[in-house]
């Protein structure tokens, strides 16, 4: 046990806690939990039975479910024990058997998960991933290293994603999907690859985005995925014909800054699916 444990904190006698761990007020630590070196846990967080945590900073009012592992070494052959970590925001829920690996020795050496995220049973977040606020990963989702998942994105169960790709804000991806290219913000996608099937209008409406803005964004989206135009032509047409807004600007910027390419068309128009390799 550690002197950093404050009043009103509950720690089960069978828990093992490293002397340097910083446990805040109101934290509950259940049976057989192991808290290793380099851990900070914020107020009101619950760590339920049999979880394992090391080299991680966890925010306030989070829930860490049984048999989850946070902060273990990255699956990177180049990792040589450098001081890396995981940072998790406030009010995030980590369900059973989730694995979150700490960063590899590149970038900022950190795997980051935002506020109010939900990682469902068995999902895996690899080294140096970034999940922005309110991301949901359904059961058994697997993210390769350095994947960036935007604000409010939802990823369906048993989906897998190549390292270094980006999933845009408020994108929704169906279960059993797989991609090695970036996923456009605000899009609905499914399959291998998850070809865009439409704009995630419901999510935009729930976020309070006006009908006028949703309509303009949808028109821009339809041009981007149209078989009639290549991406450069579609962007030129959008700028010439559609009232610009922050969501259209974000889609265009997302495309223009992509390093792996953005999945916009079906593989009939040139995309090679995973099954065709």
Task: Please provide the spans of the model-predicted regions.
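Structural signal for interior beta-strand "rungs" in well-ordered beta-sheet cores
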Residues: 5-6, 10-195
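Terminal amphipathic alpha-helical/low-complexity segments used for targeting or macromolecular assembly
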Residues: 1-14, 19-20, 25-26, 61, ...
């Amino acid at each position: 046990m550690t002197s950093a444990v404050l009043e009103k904190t509950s720690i089960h006698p069978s828990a093992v806690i490293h002397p340097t761990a910083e446990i805040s007020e109101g934290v509950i630590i259940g049976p057989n939990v192991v808290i290793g070196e380099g851990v900070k846990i914020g107020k009101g967080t619950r760590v339920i039975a049999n979880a394992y945590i090391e080299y991680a900073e966890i925010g306030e009012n989070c829930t860490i479910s049984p048999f989850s592992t946070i902060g273990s070494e990255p699956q990177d052959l180049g990792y040589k024990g450098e001081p890396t970590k995981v940072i998790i925001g406030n009010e995030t829920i980590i369900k059973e058997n989730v694995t979150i690996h700490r960063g590899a020795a590149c970038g900022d050496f950190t795997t980051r998960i935002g506020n109010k995220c939900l990682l469902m049973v068995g999902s895996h977040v690899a080294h140096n991933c970034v999940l922005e606020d309110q991301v949901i990963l359904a059961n058994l989702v697997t993210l390769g290293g350095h994947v960036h998942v935007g604000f409010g994105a939802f990823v369906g169960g048993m989906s897998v994603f190549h390292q270094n790709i980006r999933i845009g804000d408020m994108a929704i991806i169906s279960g059993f999907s797989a991609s090695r290219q970036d996923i456009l913000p605000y899009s609905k996608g499914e399959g291998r690859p998850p070809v865009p099937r439409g704009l995630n209008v419901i999510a935009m409406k729930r976020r309070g985005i006006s009908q006028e803005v949703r309509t303009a964004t949808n028109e821009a989206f339809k041009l981007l995925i149209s078989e009639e135009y290549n991406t450069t032509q579609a962007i030129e047409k959008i700028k010439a014909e559609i009232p610009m807004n922050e969501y259209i600007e974000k889609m265009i910027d997302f495309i223009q800054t992509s390093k792996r390419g953005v999945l916009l068309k079906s593989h009939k128009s040139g995309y090679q699916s995973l099954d065709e390799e």
